[in-house]
UniProtKB/Swiss-Prot annotation:
Gene name linked to the record: atcC
Record protein name field: Adaptation to cold protein C
Record's function text: Involved in cold adaptation.
Gene source species: Shewanella oneidensis (strain ATCC 700550 / JCM 31522 / CIP 106686 / LMG 19005 / NCIMB 14063 / MR-1)
Self-association state and partner proteins as the record states: Interacts with the C-terminal extension of AtcJ. Also interacts with AtcB, but not with AtcA.
Entry keyword set: Stress response
Organism taxonomic ancestry: Bacteria, Pseudomonadati, Pseudomonadota, Gammaproteobacteria, Alteromonadales
Disrupted-gene phenotype: Deletion of the gene leads to a dramatically reduced growth at low temperature.
Regulation: Interaction with AtcJ stabilizes AtcC.
Length: 298
């Protein structure tokens, strides 16, 4: 493995730390050799597990994977402080700890990506590892940004799962459905409003004809109150995260959907055909009806 030491502001964090250590005379030649030796050993182990270690280009790929994963773990363990990072690297198991941390980070954010598929790299998504992997002398390393994007998506999936578990009768879902966090919460708030805080089922379009819509529901204040009431049933940290993620148009959009629900109910009471109801939905624009269920009534 070649670890090129030069001043690269945007390169892999591992290379940046080693270059600074050399420049500041805080990293000796012997210490550098030990770090490189441990990184090479890590590359051989990775190649033996996932690649063909006897093919030079695959061994090189494993080395790039190690540099990226170690850089990621090193950033996390050192809080991106290069002096602290160097002190960690020169410890006996510093490189191993950084790799294990980086791999663990990638594994966590890969979970939802691997629900319906398998990865060459076990519990780490192949595409994500490819984004993190880097040669040591890369002018630009976007591995940390790729991880951050994956982390945001992972947290979004966790939030959706928590909403489903708390407010839906059917708690499992396929991440490939690309559910929208706002829509999942909005459907729960709407359903709870209509059916006395019941868990969401795929029966709103049939049941709505059997209830009376209260005048007090048709106000932004009431909808905001119902939204906060729902969020209060979630763990505080999660509720705060979801609340901050909601757009300013959440309550107005849900109020529009409630007015639509009133018109839909009137059509039901007038024995409108399923085809007419479906046309009415599409005329209003299903995408613009926040919280309105998308399933088809047969």
């Amino acid at each position: 493995m070649q670890l090129v030491l030069r001043d690269i502001d945007q390169g892999p964090f591992l290379s940046k730390v080693l270059a600074k250590g050399q420049a500041d005379d805080t990293l000796s030649g012997e210490q550098l050799a030990q770090i490189k030796s441990k990184a090479i050993l890590m590359s051989l182990k990775l190649a033996d597990k996932f690649y063909n270690k006897y093919k030079m280009h695959l061994l090189e790929q494993a080395a790039h994977d190690v540099i990226g994963v170690v850089s990621l773990g090193l950033m996390e363990l050192s809080n991106q402080d290069q002096q602290q990072a160097l002190r960690l690297l020169i410890t006996a198991d510093g490189v191993v700890k950084c790799f294990q941390k980086g791999w663990s980070m990638l594994s966590v954010v890969s979970k939802h990506k691997l629900v319906n598929s398998k990865s060459l790299y076990g519990d780490v998504d192949k595409f994500l590892l490819e984004q993190v992997s880097t040669p040591p002398d890369a002018d630009e390393w976007l591995g940390y940004e790729a991880y951050q994007d994956a982390l945001v998506e992972h947290q979004r999936q966790q939030s959706i799962a928590a909403l489903m578990a708390q407010f839906y009768a059917q708690t499992s879902y396929d991440p490939l459905d690309f559910l929208n966090l706002e829509s999942v919460l909005a459907e729960a708030v709407l359903y709870r409003m209509l059916f006395d805080n019941a868990k969401v089922r795929q029966d709103l379009k049939k049941r709505i004809a059997k209830i009376s819509l209260q005048d007090e529901w048709f106000s932004l204040e009431y909808i905001e109150q119902q939204t906060q009431q729902a969020l209060a049933e979630l763990p505080a940290e999660l509720a705060d995260t979801i609340g901050k993620d909601l757009g300013k148009n959440f309550a107005p959009a849900l109020l529009r959907t409630l007015h639509f629900a009133k018109s839909y109910r009137e059509l039901l009471l007038n024995d409108a055909s399923p085809e007419r109801l479906e046309r009415f939905e599409h005329k209003e624009g299903l995408v613009g009806l926040l919280g309105w269920p998308l399933y088809i009534v047969l």
